[in-house]
């Protein structure tokens, strides 16, 4: 980066340390570490209602109240605030914007008439975001269902990452529906981990059909996949049925 640039860095990420030492530009660090310029305190997890945590920027304090669920979104929120600070926006204004934030296809919660809860996280899927969504699902009460599409563009890491998600999903949900060639690895790993209620389909339409046949009042349903899977096309049908 040029000396006139600004780098916004998660100081809690050990992989970043060597990079920080080489930077000659303006630096804004964020995280839970005492060394962070923008620091967050203890995070309270409110399940489907989101999360909250205090933050400190120099001598200024504020409280973040994310409406989007998932502890994995805390780092994203901190990065978003840090970027706004880098642009000269006041902390209180940056936090206000974030506290009101919603994004289509990103951890959006919908409540159906029969008590079914739909978590629409269809916009995209990386190993970290899928793991975060599954960890949220694991914490919720009720029968937990996940319909997952494959994670694209992972290169040589693809097999390993899909297998890792297979292990995690087996421990996070009661019913698992999978779509996409790479999801065979999730299927096999989930089965190996003892998960019997896992199904792998050639098309997302078939996966949705099976899911709807099994759906009961009070179920919690997570949809997540890469952009190439276009799982958002299933949302209207699901909304009509719940």
Predicted regions and their residues:
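Extended acidic/charged loop-beta regions that coordinate divalent cations
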Residues: 11-61, 101-106, 110
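Histidine-centered acyl-transfer/condensation active-site motif
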Residues: 66
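Short, conserved beta-strand segments within well-ordered enzyme catalytic domains
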Residues: 8, 54, 145
